[in-house]
């Protein structure tokens, strides 16, 4: 237990120490302030603007900014869909994989364009090297850049005083890729290669098995194909950009994507690094670092609580595994200095602590990569990752999207506090009026509406229910998790159901699109409304939004919205399964 505590403390300490300076750096980058890297890459930036025909100084209103987001995403979606369907005709396909079906290609394109990275396929057997590099890896960069760009449009709206314009989308996205995502990914890729992650273009290699197996038909299996390919260059942006789509089907549980405890710690740090840093970026850009620290503190408290709960649930394991009433495995606990606990679906090189910490981190942010199989967690251990997504992916959340989602909850909290004391709500010197509240409510309720509607439709589809590998509460949990992952733009999965069908690929694609672009539209409209307001000096009755009381209120509102929205569904799934297990 002591080792687990030290491992978690080391991770959280490193995260905080790295996030602070990175947050200040990101703020300088996105506002075009001079800095050391700009001297080297400024010619490249200017060349990109000339190529696109863009004036980076041109200001956009929210409608123009949103139109650019939609146009860029639409072109990306069409291009990626075409690439996946035609990959069998293109080079860099040493395994001669066939083109993806229209519904799988569409689902995958939507998934990567929306920063969800839901995967209804196993990458090593379905995608060519060209598709992995020119298609999926490129989207790992640009989809994350879209989130950062939208966040900065909101920041400019908050700090403006009667001004117009939210910045330039093309300049914001270019700077996010060129100065933030590319340099960090390059450094991380080199570190991963040093740890043993492959980066090559060779064909898969056949390795002789130490213990040959027999197939179902009795044929001997003496060799195994070992996937090769450009894996390190995809793993780094998948983690840093909160994307999560792995080169291999089992993601970072695969020893090639995540071979050592050191690579595991590095990839976990990359999960949360930019979302955590953006909290400090926000504080620096509005001129009050206390605001960013308060938001970081609220996120940090929720994350550490989730990690503690998940670790405890997995250490306690299942009380019994029985067949015909006879206990086959005695209860175990990981607290007695042994491996113990629920090790099903986990890599022994990571253990319970590394697996539970990753599961909490990957669902707190909208990453979705895994180093263990969430479907094999205990009912309560698997419920926590689900709840973290259902809260709206605002506990650090996606790159950019997590913080702008959290700011919507901040406005909701300020509004509720204003109602209690009978004052017009204010945030950072700006009065929060009905229009801003309507947009904040759209952001806060999009995730619950999309998830519950999608999950309900899936439960009504006989082909989905019939495809479940597990019955009763756990089967329902698998359906709810799939809808949650798509609607919250996370991408992780419980598995257990056949996702690669036309119905599910299309339905989950619709959920991903709604979960991504409805909040973006509301955030940009809110930013435009805030930009037109004058900043008023704080008065004696102004609610402080950077003290412990406000942090508590913010956490309470986040949990209240999540609990009211999803408790009935959770009661039918993981909670019912836990009661069945312990009765």
Swiss-Prot record:
It is a multi-pass membrane protein. Signal peptide: none annotated. One of its GO terms (molecular function) is potassium ion binding. The chain crosses the membrane at residues 3-23, 66-86, 135-155, 177-197, 266-286, 293-313, 402-422, 440-460, 506-526, 549-569. Keywords: Cell inner membrane, Cell membrane, Ion transport, Membrane, Potassium, Potassium transport, Transmembrane, Transmembrane helix, Transport. Disulfide bonds: none annotated. It is found in: Cell inner membrane. It holds the Pfam family KdpA. It comes from the Bacteria. The keyword Cell inner membrane applies. GO terms for cellular component: plasma membrane. Part of the high-affinity ATP-driven potassium transport (or Kdp) system, which catalyzes the hydrolysis of ATP coupled with the electrogenic transport of potassium into the cytoplasm. This subunit binds the periplasmic potassium ions and delivers the ions to the membrane domain of KdpB through an intramembrane tunnel. The system is composed of three essential subunits: KdpA, KdpB and KdpC. Belongs to the KdpA family. This is Potassium-transporting ATPase potassium-binding subunit. The gene is kdpA.
């Amino acid at each position: 237990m002591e080792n687990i505590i030290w491992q978690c403390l080391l991770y959280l300490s490193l995260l905080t120490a790295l996030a602070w300076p990175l947050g200040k750096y990101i703020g300088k980058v996105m506002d075009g302030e001079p800095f050391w890297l700009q001297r080297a890459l400024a010619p490249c930036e200017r060349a990109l603007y000339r190529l696109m025909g863009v004036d980076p100084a041109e200001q956009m209103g929210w409608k123009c900014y949103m139109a650019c987001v939609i146009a860029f995403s639409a072109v990306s979606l069409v291009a990626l869909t075409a690439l996946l369907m035609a990959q069998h005709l293109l080079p860099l396909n040493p395994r001669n994989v066939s083109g993806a079906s229209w519904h799988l290609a569409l689902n995958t394109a939507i998934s990567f364009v929306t920063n969800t990275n839901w995967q209804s396929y196993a990458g090593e057997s379905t995608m060519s090297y060209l598709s992995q590099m020119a298609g999926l890896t490129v989207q790992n960069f640009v989809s994350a850049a879209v989130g950062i760009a939208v966040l900065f449009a909101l920041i400019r709206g908050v700090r403006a005083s009667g001004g117009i314009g939210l910045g330039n989308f093309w300049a914001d996205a270019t700077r996010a890729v060129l100065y933030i995502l590319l340099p960090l990914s390059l450094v991380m890729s080199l570190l991963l290669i040093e740890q043993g992650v492959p980066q090559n273009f060779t064909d898969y290699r056949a390795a002789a098995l130490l213990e040959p197996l027999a197939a179902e038909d009795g044929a001997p299996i003496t060799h195994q194909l070992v996937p090769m390919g450009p894996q390190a260059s995809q793993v780094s942006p998948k983690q840093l950009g909160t994307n999560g789509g792995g080169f291999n089907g089992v993601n970072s549980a695969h020893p090639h994507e995540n071979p050592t405890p050191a690579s595991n710690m590095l990839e976990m740090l990359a999960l949360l690094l930019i979302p955590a840093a953006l909290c400090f970026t926000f504080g620096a850009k509005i001129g009050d670092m206390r605001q960013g620290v308060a938001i970081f503190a609220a996120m940090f408290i929720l994350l550490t609580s989730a990690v503690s709960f998940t670790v405890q649930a997995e250490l306690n394991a299942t009380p019994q595994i029985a067949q015909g009433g006879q206990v086959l495995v005695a209860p175990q606990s990981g607290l007695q200095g042994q491996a113990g606990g629920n090790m099903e679906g986990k890599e022994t090189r990571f253990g319970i602590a590394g697996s539970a910490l990753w599961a909490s981190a990957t669902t707190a942010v909208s990453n979705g990569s895994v180093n263990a199989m969430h479907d094999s967690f205990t009912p309560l251990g698997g419920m926590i990752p689900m709840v973290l997504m259902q809260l709206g992916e605002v506990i650090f959340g996606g790159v950019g999207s997590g913080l702008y989602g959290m700011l919507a909850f901040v406005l909701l909290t300020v509004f509720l506090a204003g109602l209690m004391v009978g004052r017009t709500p204010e945030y950072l010197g700006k009065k929060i009026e009905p229009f801003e509240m309507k947009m904040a409510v759209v952001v806060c309720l999009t995730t619950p509406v999309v998830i519950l509607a999608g999950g309900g439709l899936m439960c009504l589809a006989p082909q989905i229910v019939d495809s479940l590998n597990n019955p009763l509460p756990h089967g329902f949990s698998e359906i709810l998790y799939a809808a949650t992952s798509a609607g919250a733009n996370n991408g992780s999965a419980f598995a257990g159901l056949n996702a690669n069908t036309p119905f599910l690929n299309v339905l989950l694609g619709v959920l991903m699109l709604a979960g991504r672009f409805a909040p973006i539209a509301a955030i940009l409209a809110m930013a435009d409304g805030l930009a037109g307001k004058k900043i008023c000096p704080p008065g004696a009755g102004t609610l402080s939004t950077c003290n412990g009381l406000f942090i508590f209120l913010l956490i309470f509102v986040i949990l209240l919205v999540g609990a009211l929205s999803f408790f009935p569904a959770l009661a039918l799934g993981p909670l019912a399964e836990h009661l069945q297990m312990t009765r």
